[in-house]
Amino acid sequence: ATYLSYLPKEDFRYPLRVNSDSRGKFVEILQTSHSGQFSFFTADPGITRGGHYHHTKNEKFIVLRGKAKFRFYNLLTGETYEIVTDDQFIEAVGTCRGWAHDITNVGNDELIVALWANEIFDPEAPDTIAKPFRDLRLRL
């Protein structure tokens, strides 16, 4: 905190890298060595993001704007679970290891979701394994 108080005013703000594709934007806000990574993403109506699972990573999502459907699929048992939430009821939705998950914008406006992950993404040892729900023959 003392160090930060001596930063020049020009360093009070700084640009963030925006990763954009057809699904929307993904922005990493902050990476920490002990507290994980903080990010947010966007999705237009009808767009699904995710479609993967993790071996070690835990994630928490908060819908800041819009309405989202979270779908989960247990890789061992085949059990499915679904949560629909929106910006009118602020709650955290967590993922669990061994469950594939995706998030769909089921509202009429842009979806904005804040995301915390317990560990920083490591391109040398990625822990995001693609498992699109269309490959699981789900009836969701």
Please annotate each region the language model reported.
Residues G36-F38, T48, K67, T80, ...:
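Intrinsic-disorder/low-complexity, polar/charged segments enriched in Ser/Thr/Lys/Arg/Asp/Glu/Gln
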Residues A1-K25, D135-L140:
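C-terminal substrate-binding subdomain of Rossmann-fold SDR/epimerase-dehydratase oxidoreductases
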Residues N74-G98, D102-T104, I112:
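Short acidic-glycine-tyrosine-enriched beta hairpin
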Residues T77, A100, T104-L140:
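Double-stranded beta-helix
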Residues F12-G51, K57:
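A short glycine-rich, His/Asp/Glu-containing loop-to-beta-strand
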Residues T56-L75:
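Glycine- and acidic-residue-biased ligand/ion/polar-headgroup-sensing regions
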Residues E28-I29, R49-H55, I62, I83-T85, ...:
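Short histidine-centered beta-strand/loop micro-motifs
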Residues T42, I62, A92-G94:
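Residue-level "contact hotspot" at macromolecular interaction interfaces
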